[in-house]
C-alpha cells in the first residue's frame, strides 16, 4: 500500500492558514492533492491537520482517495517536528511495516503527478531504502571563515565543467513504514 501523507497546520505564524490560501486559482494544498489523486500508484492520501478550516477546504473538494486525519495538538505546535506527526499517524493507524509512506509538503505546489510516479517507480526497484527530491544547484558556496565549500577557488571551474551540488528541495520523501518506525526519521538507510 502506498500512502501519501500531507501535514498541514492551521497555526503558521508567518502566514496564518497558508496551506489553504489561494495560489493560482485554488487552495495551496489542493495542488498536491490533485496531482496525487491522478497518481495510480498512490492508494490513499492523508491530510493531517489541526484546523477545521483546512478540513472543510479539503472535504469540500470531494476527492476520491483523500481523507483527513486530525493530528494531536502537541504535534501541531510551532516546536513539533514533521516526524512527530508522521509517527503519530503511523502508530495510530497501525500501518504495515512494508507499506510505502510518502511525505508530501503542501508548500511545493509545482510537483506534478509524473514526479510522484517516477519517484515511486524508482523506489520500487529496491535500490534505495528512502528517497528525497532535490534540485541541482550550480552556485559556489563559502563558509563564514572564508573557505570555499564546493570548489577550489584557485582553479575555478568553467560553468560547463561544474556538476554543481544536489540541494534538498523538500517537495516529497519516500520511505517504508518500518524504516520510519526504526529510525524515527523521514530518511534512513541508503538514500536516493
Regions found by a protein language model. Give the residues of each.
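Short beta-strand segments
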Residues: 7-9, 103-105, 133-135
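Short internal beta-strands
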Residues: 44-49, 133-134
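A short, N-terminal amphipathic alpha-helix
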Residues: 28-44, 56-57
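N-terminal nucleotide-binding beta1-loop-alpha1 segment
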Residues: 1-16
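Residues at the starts of beta-strands that form the adenosine-phosphate
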Residues: 1, 43-45, 100, 129
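Conserved core of the sugar-phosphate nucleotidyltransferase
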Residues: 78-88, 97, 108-192
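Short phosphate-binding loop-to-helix
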Residues: 46, 52-102, 111-114, 118
Amino acid at each position: 500500500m502506498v500512502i501519501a501523507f500531507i501535514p498541514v497546520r492551521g497555526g503558521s505564524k508567518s502566514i496564518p492558514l497558508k496551506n489553504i490560501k489561494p495560489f493560482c486559482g485554488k487552495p495551496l494544498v489542493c495542488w498536491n492533492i490533485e496531482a496525487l489523486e491522478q497518481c495510480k500508484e498512490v492508494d490513499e492520501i492523508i491530510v493531517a491537520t489541526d484546523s477545521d478550516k483546512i478540513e472543510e477546504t479539503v472535504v469540500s473538494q470531494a476527492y476520491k482517495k483523500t481523507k483527513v486525519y486530525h493530528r494531536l495538538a502537541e504535534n501541531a505546535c510551532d516546536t513539533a517536528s514533521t516526524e512527530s506527526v508522521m509517527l503519530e499517524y503511523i502508530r495510530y493507524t497501525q500501518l504495515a511495516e512494508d507499506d510505502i509512506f510518502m511525505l508530501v509538503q503542501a508548500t511545493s505546489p509545482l510537483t506534478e503527478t509524473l514526479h510522484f510516479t517516477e519517484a515511486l517507480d524508482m523506489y520500487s526497484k529496491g535500490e534505495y531504502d528512502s528517497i528525497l527530491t532535490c534540485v541541482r544547484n550550480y552556485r559556489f558556496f563559502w563558509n563564514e571563515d572564508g573557505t570555499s565549500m564546493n570548489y577550489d577557488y584557485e582553479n575555478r571551474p568553467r560553468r560547463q565543467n561544474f556538476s554543481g551540488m544536489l540541494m534538498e528541495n523538500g517537495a516529497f520523501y519516500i520511505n517504508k513504514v518500518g524504516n520510519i518506525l526504526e529510525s524515527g526519521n523521514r530518511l534512513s538507510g541508503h538514500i536516493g
